Amino acid sequence: MRVDGDTWDITSSVGATALGVAAARATETLRADALIRDPFAQILVDATGKATGWERLVAGDIDWPDPEAGRIYDRMVDYQATRTHFFDEYFLAAAAAGIRQVVILASGLDSRAYRLDWPAGTTVYEIDQPQVLKFKDSALAAHQPTAQRRGVAIDLREDWPAALRAAGFDSAQPTAWLAEGLLPYLPADAQDNLFRDIGVLSAAGSRVAVEGYEGKLVLDESEEEAVRREQVRAAFKTAIDVDVTIENLIYEDENRADPAEWLDAHGWSVTKTDAHDEMARLGRPVAEDVERGTFRGQLIQGELR
């Protein structure tokens, strides 16, 4: 369970979810019809220094004791590939519009500072826990970013705006912000504070992109559905020896603001794309039976009015 002031590295708590996301990007990269190409994802997964279940997943070396677990992983890869592609396009459009300052909030194992074709003069700020940034710095030490990359080692529940400014951030310049895979790991009030701080730090012409969710991440279910979910989770753990119980890491606050509505009410012109619709558009439709049992992601973009 989460507690105030908790911390983590890349193999524990919230940090472990970033490793799973990197594994999904690495898996996608190996597909013939890949939506994204991320050669750094495999490097990051391998850098854990041991033969992990995530490595076996990427290699396809998994004997699933329950086929449904493998199907869920495939769906996870499709979703991660879709949202990565969506936010890649967001950044490229921001760069084409002349934005040269980028902030990735809770960056985890994001590799965009290394793999996107940034215009000259672009600075990418990555904010995350100190141990997470330390791991990535070490794993990618032999590789050069395609923009000026600056790590900002701080928890987003602390005074991150001051740390960002200390790293060289210029609030007089337009910024492209990204909060991807972040909001459920923040309490509702911390989410409001995050958006408020983004607004204060944003100059005219700034843009923001957010991954939101329609309804609950952990859906209401019948007793039979709960039993089946636990069976699949056990199969996943048996296959890859990893147990990330998402319910213990997120905040399901009932008073959480809808991100698109909050941003629209605070000076941003917002567009919202349903993630399942985007998956279908990109040729990765969600099967009807899987769709009924999963949350619906919302891919949100805004431009400061």
Curated annotation (Swiss-Prot):
Q: Which InterPro entries match?
A: Ppm1/Ppm2/Tcmp, SAM-dependent_MTases_sf, SAM_mthyl_Trfase_ML2640-like
Class of enzymatic activity (EC top level): transferase
Q: Example GO biological process term?
A: methylation
Q: Where does S-adenosyl-L-methionine bind?
A: D128, D155, L156
Q: Which cysteines are joined by disulfide bonds?
A: none
Provide the E.C. number(s) assigned to this enzyme: 2.1.1.-
Sorted UniProt keywords: Methyltransferase, S-adenosyl-L-methionine, Transferase
Supply one GO molecular-function term.
methyltransferase activity
Cited Pfam families:
LCM (PF04072)
The highest taxon in the source lineage is: Bacteria
Entry's family note:
Belongs to the UPF0677 family.
Q: Which NCBIfam families match?
A: mthyl_TIGR00027
According to its UniProt entry, the function of this protein is described as: Exhibits S-adenosyl-L-methionine-dependent methyltransferase activity.
Protein name (record): Putative S-adenosyl-L-methionine-dependent methyltransferase MAB_4607c
Species of origin:
Mycobacteroides abscessus (strain ATCC 19977 / DSM 44196 / CCUG 20993 / CIP 104536 / JCM 13569 / NCTC 13031 / TMC 1543 / L948)
